[in-house]
Swiss-Prot record:
It comes from Drosophila melanogaster (Fruit fly). It is found in: Secreted. GO terms for molecular function: catechol oxidase activity; metal ion binding; tyrosinase activity. This is Phenoloxidase 3. It catalyses: 2 L-dopa + O2 = 2 L-dopaquinone + 2 H2O; L-tyrosine + O2 = L-dopaquinone + H2O. Residues 1-48 form a propeptide. The gene is PPO3.
Length: 683
């Protein structure tokens, strides 16, 4: 029986033939002759003998009858794959179906080995990843980070060349020096948007977006892979939180909040020049110049034809449905957009996933927005150019237009939310429970948090093809903060033990004009920091919680990790979650004022009846849910800030009920870099 961990080796060196050595210990797949592509048929055995002599392990591949892969092979090996393109999703869905229907790990390994050299490498990575995440016999595997198999999505072409040079020239991997990523490679300080390079180009932020779309694919052969609990609402909330976090960073850099891209006829003011090469396509990601206008896209090779008028029509129909309070399914039956399920239905319509009740009527709005922008430089394929970074889930967040587009998408969701009745005091209160105070402490300072720059290394060797083996480190500079802890004082004045759900949010106190924020504005900038359950016997209690325990984030080591020490991370199998080092905004050198909000709600009302102890993932559930489980909170995502405030609660102070508390917190940024000192010797 095959060792299922060998399946992970198929992600290594994605453009090299499958019979080449894989993994840190030089594992070789013993590939049947019939599985070798025509190109390598004559030399495969000769190469394998050479490679096998230095390898530590050989993996026998069982020869089986291979299913028809022709659908998934329609996309060329050197073309660009995009989950936003329906034709590409169909190809991926076909391959996912083949992978998930294999009866045993042996059969899965055989068909994956066969497919690997025949289908597009990125499509293969996506399909195998989705299959492994959802097969009962492989869902506990630790998937390699996408950055370590496709480093070209995360570093510029100059750095990629330097890494190849380091790998080729310095034979002994222990003597190789890290290749340092520049912080100024996409634009100069003349570009105001470049102040946010550390957010848009952050490794963990972009990995989060890619991994979220792996866990929540838009389309799949088995509806259960897509139809996860509150999937549409999660699409709304995860992206809403990205915009809230982005706006906090903009305020940290003396910039106005992002303006929604709500007029498709207007030019896109911001250009973007990614400076990245696609290893699969062997060409550069195309730039977008300032003031580029969107055009109808007609690219028959991608079975793609979508126009500005299509987008406007879909938008009007979605807004009409929101204002009417219902959508129509394919049988012309009404589906009510109620308080509980309405946002979930809208999420599946706007994205749009396989779960949309009527794709003919409401279209593919969000996905086609990505596509129109991604092909704005060559909408008719006249110049044979591939899509820009907005066409790829792993690169889209690098582009300033991503945030303007998603700010507009969020406005559509907020239109629905504003039509819902505000929460009244009795819906927000927790009888007999009072939050007396909250404070944060970091480095001995109370209610003061500090951010700074930090260097960290990522081993990207397994994404560098056709170069000598061994570790090749990329060194990134990223935002970091000192750890902090919450101290919450709560009183339970009843005579019974109560169970509370602690909800912690953070939002700027002043707007971009330095004026106090009204709650209707501020609630849209509330960033969720944590959510957890507490037990409160009668009396007074002090609750403490460390920032590293956040329900929003995945551990720092999950982003910056050693490829050969994955056993240390077996408790963090999902990989979906916001990066820990980006938990709080950057702040300013002089300090930026935020309001820290805590609410203790009634867990007996909020809890979902299920067991989560053995779900096999870190509990970064706020943005990603729980694998194979219901979302662990009955309340709407973003509660209590997902609706407009009740009358008389124009500011946060007036919104508070006894089970809530808020305090001012100052975030200060120190413009210094904590450098790594471990430098291998050249010998």
């Amino acid at each position: 029986m095959a060792d299922k961990k060998n399946l992970l080796l198929l992600f290594d060196h994605p453009t090299e033939p499958v019979f080449m050595d894989k993994g840190g210990n030089g594992t070789v797949f013993d590939v049947p002759d019939s599985y070798v592509t025509d190109r390598y048929n004559q030399m495969c055995k000769k190469v394998q003998r050479r490679v096998s002599s230095a390898s530590e392990k050989n993996v026998q591949v069982k020869e089986i009858a291979i299913p028809d892969l022709s659908c998934s092979m329609r996309l060329g090996r050197s073309e660009q794959f995009s989950i936003f393109l329906k034709s590409h999703r169909k190809m991926a869905s076909h391959l996912i179906e083949i992978f998930t229907k294999m009866q045993t790990v042996d059969e899965l390994q055989s068909v994956a080995v066969y497919a690997r050299d025949r289908v597009n490498p990125v499509l293969f990575n996506y399909a195998l990843s989705v299959a492994l995440l959802h097969r009962p016999d492989t869902k506990d595997l630790e998937l390699p980070a996408f950055a370590q198999t496709f480093p070209d999505r995360f570093i510029d072409s100059k750095m990629l060349r330097s890494m190849r040079e380091e790998s080729f020239v310095v034979e002994r991997s222990a003597a190789r020096l890290p290749v340092v990523s520049s912080v100024k490679y996409t634009a100069s300080d003349l570009d105001v948007e470049h102040r946010l390079w550390y957010f848009r180009e952050d490794l963990g932020v972009n990995l989060h977006h890619w991994h979220w779309h792996l866990v929540y694919p838009i389309e799949a052969p088995d509806r259960s892979i897509v139809d996860k609990d509150r999937r549409g609402e999660l699409f709304y909330y995860m992206h809403q939180q990205i915009i809230a976090r982005y706006n906090a960073e903009r305020l940290s850099n003396h910039m106005a909040r992002v303006q929604p891209f709500n007029n498709l006829d207007e030019p896109i003011a911001e250009g973007y020049f990614p400076k990245m090469d696609s290893l699969v396509a062997s060409r550069a990601y195309p730039p977008r110049f300032d003031n580029t206008r969107l055009s109808d896209v007609d690219r028959p090779n991608n079975q793609l034809r979508v126009g500005i008028d299509d987008m406007k029509r879909w938008r009007e129909r979605i807004y009409e449905a929101i204002h009417q309070g219902y959508v129509l399914d394919t049988n012309n039956e009404k589906i009510v957009l109620d308080d509980a399920k309405g946002i979930d239905i809208l999420g599946n319509i706007i994205e749009a996933s396989d779960l949309t009740p009527n794709s003919t009527l409401y279209g593919d709005f969000h996905n086609m927005g990505h596509i129109l922008i991604a092909y704005s430089h060559d909408p008719t394929n006249k110049h044979l150019e591939y899509a820009g970074v907005m066409g790829d889930a792993s690169t889209a967040m690098r582009d300033p237009i991503f945030y303007k587009w998603h700010a507009f998408i969020d406005n559509m969701f907020q239109e629905h939310k504003r039509l819902l009745s505000p929460y009244e005091k009795q819906e927000l209160s927790f009888p007999d429970v009072r939050v007396e105070s909250i404070q944060v402490e970091s480095q001995g300072q109370v209610n003061r948090l500090t951010t700074f720059w930090q260097e960290s290394d990522v081993d990207m060797s397994r994404g560098l093809d056709f170069v000598p083996r061994g570790h090749v480190l990329a060194r990134f500079t990223h935002l970091q903060h000192h750890e902090f802890s919450y101290t919450i004082k709560v009183e339970n004045s009843s005579e019974a033990t109560r169970y509370g759900y602690v909800r912690i949010f953070l939002a700027p106190k002043l707007d971009d004009r330095n004026a106090p924020m009204l709650l209707e504005q501020q609630r849209l900038m509330m960033v969720e920091l944590d959510k957890f359950v507490v037990t409160m016997p009668p009396g007074s209690h002090t609750i403490t919680r460390n920032s590293t325990e956040s329900s929003v984030t995945i551990p720092f080591e999950r982003t910056f990790r050693n490829l050969d020490k994955l056993e240390e991370l077996q408790n963090f199998l999902c990989g979906c979650g916001w990066p820990q080092h980006m938990l709080i905004p950057k702040g300013r050198p002089e300090g930026l004022r935020f309001e820290l909000f805590v609410m203790v709600s009634n867990y007996e009302e909020d809890k979902v009846d299920q067991t989560v102890a053995d779900c096999g993932c870190s509990i970064a559930a706020s943005y990603c849910g729980l694998r194979d489980r219901l979302y662990p909170d009955r309340k709407s995502m973003g509660f209590p800030f997902d609706r407009k405030p009740r009358r008389g609660s124009e500011i946060l102070e007036n919104f508070l009920t006894p089970n809530m508390c808020a305090v001012e917190v100052i975030i200060t940024h120190e413009d210094r870099t904590e450098k790594l000192r471990e430098v291998p010797a050249r010998s």
